[in-house]
Structure formats: C-alpha cells, structure tokens
Amino acid sequence: MAPGRAAFSRFPRTGRLAPASAFFEAVTMNSIVNARLKQIKPSPSMAAKIVVDELRRAGREIADFTLGEPDMATPAHIARAGQDAIAGGDIRYTSPNGTPGLRRAIAGSLEQTLGAKYGLDQITVGAGAKQIIGAALTASLEPGDEVIVCAPYWVSYPDMVLLNEGKPVVVTGPESQGFKLDAASLEAAITPRTRWLILNSPSNPSGAVYSRAEMRALTEVLVRHPRVWILSDEIYAPFCYGAEAHVSPVQVEPRLAERTLIVNGMSKAYAMTGWRIGYGAGPADLIKAMSTVMSQSTSCPSAISQAAAQAALEGDQSSVTEMVAVFKARRDLIVRRLNAIPGISCATPDGAFYVYANVAGLIGRKGPDGELKTDLDVSLFFLRQAGVAVIDGGSYGLSPYVRFSFATATEVIEQGMDRLAAAVDALMAG
C-alpha cells in the first residue's frame, strides 16, 4: 500500500508550488538517503504550513484550516511551572523515560479517566505523542510485520510503519459507517503477520468517536487474536461533543491491557504543541524497549517541559473544559457554513477538532487552472481562489474529501467560509 499523497511545497530555487512528493524527490536526488526513507512522504500538514507561511510573508491573506493546533495560549499556571523550573535550575537531563513526578501524574490521570492502574515502569515520556508511536513501532516491528490502520487515518501512521520496515494494511471506514472500522473488516484484515492495530478515537481527520458498543465489537475480535497488539492513540480524548464519551479498549476489555499501548500527550488538551510532551502506558517490557529507543535519539524529554506537563495534569482542569466548549461552538459553526456551500457536504463530527468534508460535488468542475479532477485539485483551488488552506483527503487515505481544522478563531472561520462560498459560487456558475 502506498501512503496517501502529500500536500504541496515548493521546488528549491524556483519557488513554484509543487506536490510535496516532487519536492522530496528533488532534494534527495543523487543523495545519501537510503531506499527505505525514499518511500516516506513529508507530513502534508507541515508542508501546507510552510506554503501558508510563505504566502503570508508575500502579503497574501490566508484563512488557515490546516494545522491541528489549538489557538489558545498555554494556561498560565502551566507556563509558570515551566518558568519556575528554569528559575530553580531544573534544566538538566532526566531519565530517558521521564521524571518520576511526571510519571506519577500520568498514572494518576489514567486511573482517574480510564480506571486503569499503571506502575511507573509501565509509563514512558517522549518528545510528543508522535515520538511515542514511533518508538513503539521501532521497538516491536520486524521487517514485513503488518499494521492495520483505518482510513481515513492520521497522515503519519502509514509512513511511520514504513520507516520501521513494516507494512501498513489500510482498511477503509466509509462515510456511511461514520469513518469507523467495524468488526468484520478488522477480522478480515488480520493475518499471521499482523502485529498492531492502530486505533484513534476521537479520530484525526474525521472526528469519529467509537461508542462503547463499537469498541466492544472490535475488542471481541482482538481477544481471539493474541498476537495482535493495540496502539490506542487517545490524544483527542477530552474532545467529545456528542452523547458518546471517549472509551478506551482497556476500559471495555481489561484483558487486552497486557497488549495495549495507550498513547496520549499534552499538545491538544492543554494547548502545549510546542512544549513537545507525549506519553505511553503499557506492558513494562514494551515500555522499557521504547525508552531505550528514545534514549538513543533524544536522550530524554525536556526537563522544563516535563515540569509544565506535571503541573498540567495535577492542576486545575477548567481550561480543558472551557476549550472543549469553545471548540464545540466552532464545530457547529463550520459544519453549518460548509453545508450551505454547493458541492460540499459534511456530517457533524462527534470529537476532535476536524471536519472531513465531502467535495464530490466539486470534482469535474472547471476552475481558472483547469478541471478539478481530485480532492488535491480542490484543495489547491481553495487556496488559490479563496485564500483558504485545507488538506486533501488523499493524504488521509480516503477521497474525495478535504480536512478542515476548526482549532482556529471564530473570525477566521467566518471569513474563510465567506471567501470559500464566493469562490465556489463562481466555480459552479462557470
């Protein structure tokens, strides 16, 4: 399986827009880069951010819906903890798996939210949840091992598997199914080479949230396949807006805890994307191996960021509640505005802070740059004609869609939707 297409970047020296994959090929031609890495695409959201920043520097006004980054400031008490760490000289190396204080705070949070108990030797801390996922795959995959991923998926999952010589096995969760994996599809995808199932609920990019019944159906399959481990990416756990609260596989089926890695972090819930703290909780032997991997890459997470993360988990949680309420209002706004635009439709996501909008009604239309044949063409049309930046659905493994992040100011949503509506009206009239 080839990973989804990347977004867009720039050719070196020429400055003209090009697919990020073409950029990657241009800069690695005749280089020392190994064959495995040549399969890997740059992150589409990061590539899009580069283009958006360049366009803004050139004076273009862009409504940016590409990055999943809360626009709020890190809560003051968390930032103060980081400042206090600096002032107090807490600026040295820590253990590769994180400070005991932070790991105790993580254990307390997991017991409170999931009802699951983890010892300090079952928890490790890294430079963001992405590093935790990467370390788990590095520590566990043998060449050719298979990892099941549900499309639409977070863009990094397949490439991280490939980077570690595994094979991504993509199973589509269609829109008619709420963009979710069902038990029958999971059962059919499992082979003797299957090593992991990656679950992400709430989901990036679709906002899908698995109900307890849906999670139960998946865990019943997994119980029958003891070789298959579960990587449960729960970074968006607080962001649930509907009747269904977040549920983890270890809550539904505690027997799976012995082969489940819970992944979470500080970036989303506490507006700490730049602090770079994520964590994993799971069986001690896996955690030890992951910590060894990270000790040979980053040595340890930032001591300053760890102090702030501990304050976040142990302190007042009202900022999280307030953020969720703000994002729910933004979700309602962007869904209403998108569904009012001809050729675009979207369901209301139950979680995270993304809308995965269906743009099938725009495919085949002719814009100023030619026919819109793919959702990548649609995303480029939005950028060039409306100054609206989104990520194409092909990058997430399922077309014809585009992803909007609503982790941005209400005014940006309103302005972006106004410009998008005008551009699409002109397209439909052409």
Where are these regions (language model features)?
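PLP-dependent class I/II
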Residues: 23-33, 37, 41-64, 68-85, ...
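Aromatic (phenylalanine/tyrosine) cluster motif
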Residues: 8-11, 23-24
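Conserved N-terminal alpha-helix of the aminotransferase class I/II PLP-enzyme fold
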Residues: 93-126
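A glycine-/small-polar-enriched, mobile loop at the entrance of the PLP active site in fold-type I
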Residues: 63-69, 84-103
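Extreme N-terminal basic, low-complexity initiation segments
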Residues: 2-7
